[in-house]
């Protein structure tokens, strides 16, 4: 009820004919509107770790409802575009793919991605839920990386990313958020 873009990364066929496992990764949008029933469902689903990729401005406006729950480890690892690149984007001098590349390739971006994967590697129990504000850009990047590492074909990765556009097409407030 309280999210519009929460889904499991399980069930994708890999290049070697196997499938990604369910209950390992959930991608999501902001969790600040979760109902008590939503929280119970997520706990039953096996959520043990939450990775919040929103920046300080976003987290200060709306705290992650899962961040203070017993039995759930919460990490805030912001993925943010560098100011120069964001200015170029807003002035039409680059496109969104340039922003994504800068978030992963700049020195700070590389460190952030490394930190994300260190957390993922260290959390061996339960499901990991990761999110940003809309579950679109930053969440899409991490989903793409995880599915790619699992050997999911590119078309399915693109299809997974594109689902958000069907979910938000009527919501004019949803946009790139950072």
PLM regions: where:
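Ser/Thr-glycine-rich phosphate-binding loops at phosphate-binding pockets of nucleotides
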Residues: 134, 138-139
């Amino acid at each position: 009820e309280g999210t519009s873009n929460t889904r499991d990364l399980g069930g994708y066929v890999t290049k070697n004919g196997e499938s990604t496992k369910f209950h390992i990764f959930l991608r999501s949008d902001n969790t600040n509107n979760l109902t008590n029933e939503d929280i119970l469902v997520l706990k039953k689903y096996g959520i043990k770790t939450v990775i919040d990729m929103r920046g300080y401005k976003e987290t200060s406006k709306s705290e992650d409802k899962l961040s203070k729950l017993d039995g759930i480890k919460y990490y805030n690892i912001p993925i943010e575009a560098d100011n120069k690149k964001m200015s170029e984007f807003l002035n039409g001098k680059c496109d969104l793919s340039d922003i994504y590349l800068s978030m992963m390739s700049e020195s700070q971006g590389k460190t952030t991605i490394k930190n994300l994967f260190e957390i993922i590697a260290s959390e061996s129990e339960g499901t990991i839920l990761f999110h940003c504000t809309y579950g679109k850009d930053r969440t899409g990047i991490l989903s793409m990386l995880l599915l790619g590492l699992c050997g999911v074909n590119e078309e399915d990765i693109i299809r997974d990313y594109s689902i958000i556009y069907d979910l938000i097409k009527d919501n004019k407030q949803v946009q790139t958020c950072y």
